[in-house]
């Protein structure tokens, strides 16, 4: 009798979790994490713990306002998400960085309100622990 083993699924070392346009967005000029996003953040925590990941939280803005202001705003957004993740029970040592990208990496056009709304976001860069 021949036994064939299924190949083990490789867990990637680095993963960027980019939310879709309905997820983890911010109101104009705000850094408050809306309560409606708590279930998404719980899912991120569960995924990180189950797959042994640490996270860098990356904040983004739309292009309204000065570049320097938007950089600061994107950092406030990253800090706000960090605080919410800690409040929800994520171990502080799993948060390995906060980054402010400001308006420099849009995912949609800043020419429309809908596009600007999609750019006011958070991304999670996950790195597996060794």
Task: Tell where the protein language model's regions lie, with residue ranges.
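Periplasmic peptidoglycan-binding/tethering modules of Gram-negative envelope proteins
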Residues: 1-55, 91, 128-130
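Periplasmic OmpA-like peptidoglycan-binding domain that tethers envelope proteins to the cell wall
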Residues: 31-34, 38, 60-130
């Amino acid at each position: 009798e021949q036994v064939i083993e299924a190949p083990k699924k490789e867990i990637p070392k680095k993963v960027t979790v980019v939310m879709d346009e309905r997820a983890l967005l911010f109101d104009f000029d705000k850094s408050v994490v809306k309560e409606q996003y708590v279930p998404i953040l719980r899912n991120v925590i569960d995924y990180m713990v189950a797959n042994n990941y640490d996270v860098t939280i990356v904040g983004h803005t739309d292009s309204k306002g000065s570049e320097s202001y938007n950089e600061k705003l994107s950092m406030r957004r990253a800090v706000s998400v960090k605080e919410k993740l800690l409040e929800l029970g994520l171990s502080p040592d799993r948060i390995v960085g906060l980054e402010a990208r400001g308006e420099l990496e849009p995912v949609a056009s800043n020419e429309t309100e809908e596009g600007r709304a999609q750019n006011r976001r958070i991304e999670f860069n996950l790195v597996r622990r060794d």
